[in-house]
Amino acid sequence: MAEKRNIFLVGPMGAGKSTIGRHLAQQLHMEFVDSDTVIEERTGADISWVFDVEGEEGFRKREEAVLEDLTQEQGIVLATGGGSVKSKENRNRLSARGVVVYLETTIEKQLARTNRDKKRPLLQTDNPREVLEQLAEERNPLYEEVADYTVRTDDQSAKVVANQIVKMLEER
């Protein structure tokens, strides 16, 4: 990979986008950016607060503005929010401005990885499994549509997944 193209990680919450993204950026000597962290920095509040006050629609508008800016950077590994692919504009930006890697995982792994995380507003419900199933039905086709590569993250360490992605990019 001679040029430093952007690498955009997409996938559901709990797939490992942030953790794998950090490993990947380190291996490739690139900058790691998490779009949710940037939204929190720009807003001065956490994601849960934005959802509570502005609703999902308000959050998605903020996310779209952040992705518009971040996808114009050069040489970054970007962990996107799980719902970022809902917007056609976001999908177009991601596809046009970098290599998109879909980190795929099972509902069981998502539940195991997110069960104590109170910073996930969509899962603050009596039946998080049902929510994750609905989100998967809605979003998985969008992840597949935008992805240049797909990697399963279920039973592998973040480092192993990052190594797989590096190999795929080298073979590109």
Swiss-Prot record:
In the UniProt record, which is one GO cellular component term?
A: cytosol
Which domain of life does this protein belong to? Bacteria
Q: What EC numbers are recorded for this enzyme?
A: 2.7.1.71
Entry's HAMAP family? Shikimate_kinase (MF_00109)
Q: Where in the cell is it found?
A: Cytoplasm
Reported function: Catalyzes the specific phosphorylation of the 3-hydroxyl group of shikimic acid using ATP as a cosubstrate.
Keyword vocabulary terms for this entry: Amino-acid biosynthesis, Aromatic amino acid biosynthesis, ATP-binding, Cytoplasm, Kinase, Magnesium, Metal-binding, Nucleotide-binding, Transferase
Q: Which family does it belong to?
A: Belongs to the shikimate kinase family.
Binding-site residues, Mg(2+): 18
Which residues hold substrate?
Answer: 36, 60, 82, 139
Record-level Gene Ontology MF annotations: ATP binding; magnesium ion binding; shikimate kinase activity
Q: Which cofactor does it need?
A: Mg(2+)
Major location (coarse): cytoplasm
* Pathway(s) where this gene product acts: Metabolic intermediate biosynthesis; chorismate biosynthesis; chorismate from D-erythrose 4-phosphate and phosphoenolpyruvate: step 5/7
Q: What is the designated name of this protein? A: Shikimate kinase
GO annotation (BP), single: aromatic amino acid family biosynthetic process
Give the matching Pfam families: SKI
Q: What PANTHER family does its record include?
A: SHIKIMATE KINASE, SHIKIMATE KINASE 1, CHLOROPLASTIC
* Database matches in PROSITE patterns: SHIKIMATE_KINASE
InterPro entries per the record?
P-loop_NTPase, Shikimate/glucono_kinase, Shikimate_kinase/TSH1, Shikimate_kinase_CS
Q: Which organism is it from?
A: Vibrio parahaemolyticus serotype O3:K6 (strain RIMD 2210633)
Q: How does it assemble?
A: Monomer.
Note describing how the cofactor binds: Binds 1 Mg(2+) ion per subunit.
Q: Does the keyword Cytoplasm apply?
A: yes
Q: Which reaction does it catalyse?
A: shikimate + ATP = 3-phosphoshikimate + ADP + H(+)
**UniProt: ATP binding residues:** 14-19, 120, 156
